Amino acid sequence: MVSARVIVQAPSHLGLRAAGVQGLPEALLAAGFAERVGARRGTRLAPPAFDPAIDAGTGLLNPHGLRVYASRLADAVGAVLDEGAFPIVLGGDCTILLGITLALRRRGRSGLLFCDGHADFYQPEAEPTGEAASMELALVTGRGPDLVTDLEGRGPLLRDEDVVVFGFRDADHAAAEGSQPLAPTIHAMDLWSIRERGAELAARDALTYLERTGGPAAFWVHLDVDVLDDAIMPAVDYHLPDGLTWEELTGVLRTAVASDHATGLDITIFNPTLDPDGRVARSLVDALVAGLTP
Protein backbone atom coordinates (compact mmCIF):
# COMPACT_ATOMS: atom_id res chain seq x y z
CA MET A 1 0.00 0.00 0.00
CA VAL A 2 1.22 3.52 -0.77
CA SER A 3 2.04 5.70 2.21
CA ALA A 4 0.30 8.94 1.19
CA ARG A 5 -3.37 9.09 2.17
CA VAL A 6 -5.93 11.59 0.95
CA ILE A 7 -9.44 12.02 2.32
CA VAL A 8 -12.28 12.62 -0.12
CA GLN A 9 -15.53 13.69 1.51
CA ALA A 10 -18.66 12.33 -0.19
CA PRO A 11 -21.56 13.34 2.09
CA SER A 12 -24.38 11.96 -0.04
CA HIS A 13 -27.59 10.30 1.06
CA LEU A 14 -29.10 10.17 -2.42
CA GLY A 15 -29.63 6.44 -2.04
CA LEU A 16 -31.20 6.52 1.41
CA ARG A 17 -34.52 8.04 2.38
CA ALA A 18 -33.45 8.82 5.95
CA ALA A 19 -31.10 11.76 6.41
CA GLY A 20 -28.13 11.87 8.77
CA VAL A 21 -25.35 9.85 7.15
CA GLN A 22 -24.23 12.95 5.26
CA GLY A 23 -22.76 14.12 8.58
CA LEU A 24 -20.28 11.22 8.69
CA PRO A 25 -17.25 13.14 7.38
CA GLU A 26 -17.60 15.98 9.87
CA ALA A 27 -18.12 13.57 12.76
CA LEU A 28 -15.05 11.45 12.03
CA LEU A 29 -12.87 14.43 11.20
CA ALA A 30 -13.94 16.18 14.41
CA ALA A 31 -12.87 13.03 16.28
CA GLY A 32 -9.37 13.42 14.84
CA PHE A 33 -9.50 10.78 12.12
CA ALA A 34 -7.41 12.63 9.51
CA GLU A 35 -4.61 13.56 11.86
CA ARG A 36 -4.45 10.16 13.51
CA VAL A 37 -4.16 8.21 10.24
CA GLY A 38 -1.85 10.78 8.69
CA ALA A 39 -4.21 11.71 5.87
CA ARG A 40 -4.42 14.96 3.95
CA ARG A 41 -7.86 16.48 3.57
CA GLY A 42 -8.75 16.65 -0.10
CA THR A 43 -11.92 17.35 -2.05
CA ARG A 44 -15.38 17.65 -0.53
CA LEU A 45 -18.16 16.94 -3.02
CA ALA A 46 -21.62 18.28 -2.24
CA PRO A 47 -24.30 16.00 -3.72
CA PRO A 48 -27.15 17.12 -5.98
CA ALA A 49 -30.42 18.07 -4.31
CA PHE A 50 -32.34 15.16 -2.80
CA ASP A 51 -35.68 14.30 -4.45
CA PRO A 52 -37.98 12.21 -2.22
CA ALA A 53 -40.06 10.96 -5.17
CA ILE A 54 -39.31 7.55 -6.64
CA ASP A 55 -38.40 7.81 -10.32
CA ALA A 56 -41.06 6.03 -12.37
CA GLY A 57 -38.66 4.89 -15.07
CA THR A 58 -36.13 3.17 -12.82
CA GLY A 59 -37.88 2.57 -9.50
CA LEU A 60 -35.06 4.42 -7.72
CA LEU A 61 -34.70 7.50 -5.62
CA ASN A 62 -32.55 10.13 -7.33
CA PRO A 63 -31.22 8.03 -10.24
CA HIS A 64 -30.14 11.06 -12.25
CA GLY A 65 -28.48 12.60 -9.20
CA LEU A 66 -26.71 9.31 -8.51
CA ARG A 67 -25.38 9.23 -12.06
CA VAL A 68 -24.12 12.81 -11.94
CA TYR A 69 -22.57 12.36 -8.50
CA ALA A 70 -20.89 9.11 -9.51
CA SER A 71 -19.09 10.85 -12.35
CA ARG A 72 -17.90 13.68 -10.12
CA LEU A 73 -16.78 11.32 -7.37
CA ALA A 74 -14.98 9.16 -9.91
CA ASP A 75 -13.05 12.23 -11.03
CA ALA A 76 -12.08 13.06 -7.44
CA VAL A 77 -11.07 9.51 -6.53
CA GLY A 78 -9.24 9.13 -9.82
CA ALA A 79 -7.23 12.28 -9.20
CA VAL A 80 -5.99 10.82 -5.91
CA LEU A 81 -5.15 7.49 -7.53
CA ASP A 82 -3.28 9.30 -10.28
CA GLU A 83 -1.14 10.99 -7.61
CA GLY A 84 -0.07 7.53 -6.50
CA ALA A 85 -1.91 8.08 -3.22
CA PHE A 86 -4.43 6.02 -1.24
CA PRO A 87 -7.93 7.55 -1.23
CA ILE A 88 -10.06 7.30 1.90
CA VAL A 89 -13.61 8.25 0.92
CA LEU A 90 -15.93 9.30 3.73
CA GLY A 91 -19.61 8.91 2.86
CA GLY A 92 -22.45 9.19 2.88
CA ASP A 93 -24.49 6.18 2.09
CA CYS A 94 -23.30 3.13 0.20
CA THR A 95 -24.20 4.49 -3.24
CA ILE A 96 -20.88 6.32 -3.21
CA LEU A 97 -19.57 2.95 -4.36
CA LEU A 98 -20.91 3.79 -7.83
CA GLY A 99 -18.45 6.66 -8.23
CA ILE A 100 -15.60 4.76 -6.63
CA THR A 101 -15.97 1.73 -8.86
CA LEU A 102 -16.36 3.98 -11.90
CA ALA A 103 -12.98 5.51 -11.07
CA LEU A 104 -11.50 2.03 -10.80
CA ARG A 105 -13.17 0.82 -14.00
CA ARG A 106 -11.73 3.76 -15.93
CA ARG A 107 -8.32 2.34 -15.02
CA GLY A 108 -8.96 -1.30 -15.76
CA ARG A 109 -10.11 -4.29 -13.75
CA SER A 110 -10.47 -4.10 -9.97
CA GLY A 111 -11.63 -6.26 -7.12
CA LEU A 112 -13.74 -5.34 -4.11
CA LEU A 113 -13.61 -6.43 -0.48
CA PHE A 114 -17.19 -5.57 0.48
CA CYS A 115 -17.44 -5.41 4.29
CA ASP A 116 -21.10 -4.89 5.10
CA GLY A 117 -23.71 -6.28 7.45
CA HIS A 118 -26.09 -6.46 4.48
CA ALA A 119 -25.44 -8.00 1.07
CA ASP A 120 -27.17 -4.98 -0.54
CA PHE A 121 -28.17 -7.06 -3.55
CA TYR A 122 -31.77 -5.86 -3.87
CA GLN A 123 -32.82 -4.85 -7.36
CA PRO A 124 -35.50 -2.20 -7.97
CA GLU A 125 -38.42 -4.59 -8.44
CA ALA A 126 -37.73 -6.01 -4.96
CA GLU A 127 -37.12 -2.67 -3.19
CA PRO A 128 -40.34 -0.63 -3.00
CA THR A 129 -38.65 2.23 -1.12
CA GLY A 130 -36.40 2.93 -4.10
CA GLU A 131 -33.34 3.14 -1.85
CA ALA A 132 -30.29 2.43 -3.98
CA ALA A 133 -28.25 2.12 -0.77
CA SER A 134 -29.72 -1.37 -0.44
CA MET A 135 -28.87 -2.16 -4.07
CA GLU A 136 -25.34 -0.90 -4.64
CA LEU A 137 -23.65 -4.29 -4.93
CA ALA A 138 -26.22 -5.33 -7.51
CA LEU A 139 -25.75 -2.05 -9.39
CA VAL A 140 -21.96 -2.12 -9.57
CA THR A 141 -22.09 -5.71 -10.85
CA GLY A 142 -24.45 -4.66 -13.63
CA ARG A 143 -27.89 -5.53 -12.27
CA GLY A 144 -30.48 -2.78 -12.54
CA PRO A 145 -31.32 0.16 -14.79
CA ASP A 146 -28.69 1.12 -17.36
CA LEU A 147 -28.88 4.71 -16.11
CA VAL A 148 -26.89 3.70 -13.02
CA THR A 149 -25.29 0.39 -14.02
CA ASP A 150 -23.77 1.29 -17.39
CA LEU A 151 -22.02 4.51 -16.39
CA GLU A 152 -20.07 5.98 -19.31
CA GLY A 153 -20.81 2.77 -21.21
CA ARG A 154 -18.40 0.93 -18.92
CA GLY A 155 -20.82 -1.37 -17.12
CA PRO A 156 -20.72 -3.65 -15.33
CA LEU A 157 -18.21 -1.78 -13.21
CA LEU A 158 -17.10 -4.96 -11.43
CA ARG A 159 -17.10 -8.61 -12.39
CA ASP A 160 -18.94 -10.94 -10.02
CA GLU A 161 -15.84 -13.09 -9.60
CA ASP A 162 -13.82 -10.08 -8.44
CA VAL A 163 -16.01 -9.38 -5.40
CA VAL A 164 -15.82 -10.78 -1.87
CA VAL A 165 -18.86 -10.04 0.30
CA PHE A 166 -17.50 -10.15 3.84
CA GLY A 167 -19.39 -10.19 7.14
CA PHE A 168 -23.01 -9.99 5.95
CA ARG A 169 -25.66 -11.41 8.24
CA ASP A 170 -28.96 -10.51 6.59
CA ALA A 171 -29.53 -13.46 4.24
CA ASP A 172 -32.66 -14.72 6.00
CA HIS A 173 -34.08 -11.23 6.46
CA ALA A 174 -33.37 -10.24 2.86
CA ALA A 175 -34.95 -13.42 1.53
CA ALA A 176 -38.05 -12.83 3.63
CA GLU A 177 -38.23 -9.27 2.26
CA GLY A 178 -38.04 -10.55 -1.31
CA SER A 179 -34.47 -9.59 -2.20
CA GLN A 180 -32.78 -11.37 -5.03
CA PRO A 181 -30.19 -13.81 -3.63
CA LEU A 182 -26.50 -13.15 -4.01
CA ALA A 183 -25.27 -14.54 -7.30
CA PRO A 184 -23.31 -17.79 -6.83
CA THR A 185 -20.51 -16.26 -8.92
CA ILE A 186 -19.85 -13.75 -6.10
CA HIS A 187 -17.54 -14.99 -3.34
CA ALA A 188 -19.61 -14.81 -0.14
CA MET A 189 -18.28 -14.99 3.43
CA ASP A 190 -21.05 -14.46 5.94
CA LEU A 191 -20.54 -13.52 9.59
CA TRP A 192 -20.81 -17.10 10.82
CA SER A 193 -18.20 -18.47 8.42
CA ILE A 194 -15.88 -15.63 9.47
CA ARG A 195 -16.41 -16.42 13.14
CA GLU A 196 -15.67 -20.09 12.52
CA ARG A 197 -12.41 -19.21 10.78
CA GLY A 198 -11.45 -16.16 12.86
CA ALA A 199 -11.73 -12.64 11.45
CA GLU A 200 -8.08 -12.08 10.53
CA LEU A 201 -7.64 -15.51 8.98
CA ALA A 202 -10.90 -15.02 7.08
CA ALA A 203 -9.62 -11.68 5.81
CA ARG A 204 -6.43 -13.38 4.65
CA ASP A 205 -8.57 -15.96 2.84
CA ALA A 206 -10.48 -13.13 1.15
CA LEU A 207 -7.23 -11.49 0.03
CA THR A 208 -5.86 -14.78 -1.24
CA TYR A 209 -8.95 -15.05 -3.42
CA LEU A 210 -8.77 -11.44 -4.66
CA GLU A 211 -5.03 -11.70 -5.34
CA ARG A 212 -5.29 -15.01 -7.21
CA THR A 213 -3.50 -15.56 -10.49
CA GLY A 214 -5.73 -14.32 -13.29
CA GLY A 215 -7.74 -12.14 -10.91
CA PRO A 216 -7.95 -8.36 -10.63
CA ALA A 217 -4.74 -6.36 -10.42
CA ALA A 218 -5.90 -4.50 -7.30
CA PHE A 219 -8.84 -4.25 -4.92
CA TRP A 220 -10.81 -1.62 -3.03
CA VAL A 221 -12.08 -1.96 0.56
CA HIS A 222 -15.69 -0.94 1.22
CA LEU A 223 -16.65 -0.55 4.89
CA ASP A 224 -20.28 -0.09 5.85
CA VAL A 225 -20.14 0.37 9.62
CA ASP A 226 -23.27 -1.75 10.07
CA VAL A 227 -20.94 -4.74 9.64
CA LEU A 228 -20.20 -4.06 13.31
CA ASP A 229 -22.21 -5.54 16.15
CA ASP A 230 -25.36 -3.53 16.66
CA ALA A 231 -24.59 -3.40 20.38
CA ILE A 232 -21.45 -1.31 19.75
CA MET A 233 -22.60 0.49 16.58
CA PRO A 234 -26.11 1.80 17.25
CA ALA A 235 -25.62 4.86 15.02
CA VAL A 236 -27.02 3.27 11.86
CA ASP A 237 -30.48 3.46 10.32
CA TYR A 238 -31.05 -0.24 9.70
CA HIS A 239 -30.34 -2.57 12.60
CA LEU A 240 -29.42 -6.25 12.72
CA PRO A 241 -28.37 -8.23 15.79
CA ASP A 242 -24.77 -9.41 16.11
CA GLY A 243 -21.86 -8.31 13.91
CA LEU A 244 -18.10 -7.84 14.13
CA THR A 245 -16.42 -6.58 17.29
CA TRP A 246 -14.10 -3.57 17.28
CA GLU A 247 -11.14 -5.92 17.54
CA GLU A 248 -12.34 -8.04 14.62
CA LEU A 249 -12.81 -4.95 12.46
CA THR A 250 -9.33 -3.74 13.34
CA GLY A 251 -7.84 -7.08 12.37
CA VAL A 252 -9.68 -7.17 9.06
CA LEU A 253 -8.60 -3.65 8.13
CA ARG A 254 -5.01 -4.22 9.20
CA THR A 255 -4.84 -7.33 7.04
CA ALA A 256 -6.49 -5.68 4.03
CA VAL A 257 -4.57 -2.42 3.89
CA ALA A 258 -1.24 -4.15 4.45
CA SER A 259 -1.63 -5.67 1.00
CA ASP A 260 0.22 -4.02 -1.88
CA HIS A 261 -2.92 -4.66 -3.93
CA ALA A 262 -5.17 -2.45 -1.75
CA THR A 263 -5.88 0.82 -3.58
CA GLY A 264 -8.36 2.64 -1.33
CA LEU A 265 -11.03 2.54 1.35
CA ASP A 266 -14.49 3.99 1.81
CA ILE A 267 -16.47 4.33 5.04
CA THR A 268 -20.25 4.63 4.97
CA ILE A 269 -23.56 4.64 6.88
CA PHE A 270 -22.46 6.00 10.26
CA ASN A 271 -25.22 8.43 11.28
CA PRO A 272 -23.96 10.98 13.81
CA THR A 273 -27.49 12.18 14.60
CA LEU A 274 -27.86 8.82 16.39
CA ASP A 275 -24.67 9.47 18.39
CA PRO A 276 -25.47 12.73 20.20
CA ASP A 277 -22.51 12.66 22.59
CA GLY A 278 -19.97 11.53 19.98
CA ARG A 279 -19.02 8.45 21.97
CA VAL A 280 -19.59 6.01 19.10
CA ALA A 281 -17.69 8.22 16.65
CA ARG A 282 -14.69 8.24 18.97
CA SER A 283 -14.77 4.46 19.33
CA LEU A 284 -15.09 4.07 15.57
CA VAL A 285 -12.11 6.34 14.96
CA ASP A 286 -10.07 4.41 17.54
CA ALA A 287 -10.79 1.15 15.70
CA LEU A 288 -10.11 2.66 12.27
CA VAL A 289 -6.82 4.14 13.43
CA ALA A 290 -5.76 0.81 14.93
CA GLY A 291 -6.59 -0.92 11.66
CA LEU A 292 -4.96 1.65 9.38
CA THR A 293 -1.70 2.28 11.22
CA PRO A 294 1.16 -0.23 11.55
Spans of model-derived segments:
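Catalytic cores of soluble, metal-dependent hydrolases
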Residues: V2-I88, I100, R106, P184-P294
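Short, glycine/acidic-enriched loop or turn micro-motifs at the edges of active sites
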Residues: A119, D170, V225-D229
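Active-site environment of divalent metal-dependent phosphoester hydrolases
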Residues: Y122, D172-A174, P272-L274
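Short, glycine/polar-rich helix-capping loops at beta-to-alpha or helix-loop-helix junctions
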Residues: A171-A183
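Active-site histidine-anchored catalytic micro-motif
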Residues: D82-D150, D160, S259
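Short, structured patches in soluble enzyme cores that scaffold and shape functional sites
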Residues: F114-G117, T141, D162-D170, D190-W192, ...
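A general structural motif
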Residues: F166-H173, T245-T250
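Active-site flanking residues adjacent to catalytic metal/cofactor-binding acidic residues
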Residues: V8, G92, C115-G117, F166, ...
